[in-house]
Amino acid sequence: MNLVEVATTKPYRVRIGSGAVHELAGLVAGRRAAVVCPQTLVHLVPRFGIDDLVVIEVPDAEAAKTPEVLVNGWRRLAEANMTRGDIIVGFGGGATTDVAGFLAATWMRGIDVIHVPTTVLAMADAAIGGKTGVNIPAGKNLVGAFHEPIGVLCDTELLTTLPAREVRSGLAEIVKCGFIKDPVILDVISNHPRLALDVTSQTFVEVLTRAITVKAGVVSADLHERTSSREEVGRERLNYGHTLAHAIEAHKHFTWRHGEADAVGMVFAAELSHRYLGLSDEVVARTRTILSEIGLPVTCDEIKWADLRKTMNVDKKTRVDPQTGRQVLRFVGIHKPGQVAMIVDPDEAALAECYDRCSAR
């Protein structure tokens, strides 16, 4: 089993490998547990070996991330008389761990949470780093809190029943970690794309562990996204490709998987980086190639740029110019794989041109 340490204020470990979930009972250590999970996973909860627990069912995927689901969760916690000494377990995909984390952050002003992610995306990203949140009509993840888990169990056995689409979507986040910090990930996936998509392979475990190591290092240095300034990049480097991706998800009414939208977002970020940061033509082309090889989309030409641009105004990386009061867009870009920089207030015409290039088939 692989272990990755997340060295934040309260350090915790991410356990990665087959059978990791069997360590949950020991981590709960006799406390009462509220397991937050979708209905499709309820039948697996008895395997945890926890005697005293309550199950809080939530909808699948992004449908879970609503204020209404939170209110129901708080009601269930109250009915179960959950105390500050008890614990919440987030068991599911990234949306489930987001909701479980937010419930833990807000119940009695904060109780412990452990995440047992069941998708590649949740293992590589959502379950690690303490970000929680829900969506509102104005945008994705606009309401939330930072609340770190006390442990994360990435049991690769839980991935074996995932649809291929979910595996591909999650692998997009792993590819992202290759571009922002660890180019070895890109080499491994380029050389072995089929094995990278096989959740039972050692190749998959290697790139997953590398991606988690990247995420752990970034959040350990900048847990609350406070290192980033107008031009500097701290934890926001994890949002490479996300500015466009979140806009696409909103316009697609969340019918696209996050990784699918982020794949297009990374192509856009590469084009923007080519324009402003001197990213080579070769890396721009490689971005398209590696994402295509694992079955992810690299274009989204059915949505007009003007519509996406309006949605970007509520992106969390946007800042207000103190002198003019004008909203300033900021994009995470790369000079080369592993070398990140912030692109601040790019020209509107350049943005449209990069999207056109991104959408060109």
UniProtKB/Swiss-Prot annotation:
**Residues that bind Zn(2+), according to the entry?**
173, 242, 258
* Cell compartment(s), UniProt: Cytoplasm
**Top-level EC class:** lyase
Highest taxon of the source?
A: Bacteria
Reactions this protein catalyses: 7-phospho-2-dehydro-3-deoxy-D-arabino-heptonate = 3-dehydroquinate + phosphate
Record note on cofactor: Binds 1 divalent metal cation per subunit. Can use either Co(2+) or Zn(2+).
Protein name, per record: 3-dehydroquinate synthase
Q: Tell me which species this is from.
A: Cutibacterium acnes (strain DSM 16379 / KPA171202)
**Source taxonomy lineage?**
Bacteria, Bacillati, Actinomycetota, Actinomycetes, Propionibacteriales
